[in-house]
Each structure stands twice: as structure tokens, then as C-alpha cells.
Amino acid sequence: YQVRYSGLGHASAAMQVRVDFKLPGPKKFTILSETGSGMLRHHVLEPLVKAERQNAVVTSNDGSALVPANYKFRLVAAPDDNGNGKYVLEATPRTSKQRFLFHGTIWLNASDFGIERVQGKLPHSPSFWVKNVTFDYHTQKIGAFWLPATNKTRAHIRFFGHAVLEIRYHDFDLTSIAPVPTAAAAGGRP
């Protein structure tokens, strides 16, 4: 995790975090190192890691999952006849009551429909102090799985300036992986 602030002065902080996960969960977060501004580490990065610990289990029943119950999807672009390009969807929240739903764009891989990128804006400010939150989330395919690659979030801090939070995911170690059965693999329709 890395955060940069500019406004009434400039500051930055970084935190390296190891995340371990084994089914059925939960994820285990271990802070390996911290550098930079103590204020940003204690008031931004540590609460972020704490929130990720609390929200580590995401299911299709979760109020922020990318499912039709939470979003209206509109196809914006599709691959050409040769399979070149991506499926591009516009996502609009079905309700304004869920805190972390977003307005944005989703890019899907043309061959396996994996989510490659999500870019959007939160329709509501998460707090009085934070507004105009935008994000750009990228994934990477490792083996048969789409896993996080980067997440860059920008926000305006009321009266004080701007902050950029960047999370880079790397050094994945996948062991004992069994693909999840799909309806198509079971002889059904997807």
C-alpha cells in the first residue's frame, strides 16, 4: 500500500502487507514493513488494513458484489468477429443505499469473461472529509485465476488537498488449486 498526499504540504507513506488465504478462509493480514509519514500510516494505511481484515470475506450475497442484484449492466463494446478486443460494460448501481456501489466501466476478457479492469467513481462520499473518490482497478491472470494487480484510488480531502492511494499486488503463491465447477462443465448451461 502506498499513499501520497498533496495540499497543505506534501507527505507519503508506504506499508508492505502479506496476505495469506486458505479455503475456507479467512484471510490473514501481516504488516511486514512501514515507512514514511506517521500521520498517514496511522490515519490512512492502518485503518485501511483493518477494514480489509473485516471485509475479507466477499460473497455474491455481499451488498457490493458485481452481480445483477446490485447493478444494471449495459454492453458498451464487444470483441470483433476475430475475437479481438474486450467486452466493455457500463455499471450503474440499482440502489443508492449501499455504501460502496459505484458508477463505472468494467472490461471483461473475451475468451473467459474474467474481469480485467474496473474503473469508476463512488456516487457518495465515504465521509464528510473525503469526496470525489475515483478508482482504477486492474487484475492479472495467474494460471486459471484472475487476481488483483493494482488498485489506484484518488480522492479530494475537503479543505486540505488531494490523496492518491495505490495498492500493488504481487508474489502470489498458489498451491493445491482445484478449479471451481461451472454449470457448463456439469453439462448445464452457463
Which residue stretches match the model-derived regions?
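Structured extracytoplasmic
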Residues: 1-103, 111-114, 123-133, 140-145, ...
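Short, positively biased Gly/Pro-containing turn/loop motifs at secondary-structure boundaries
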Residues: 146-150
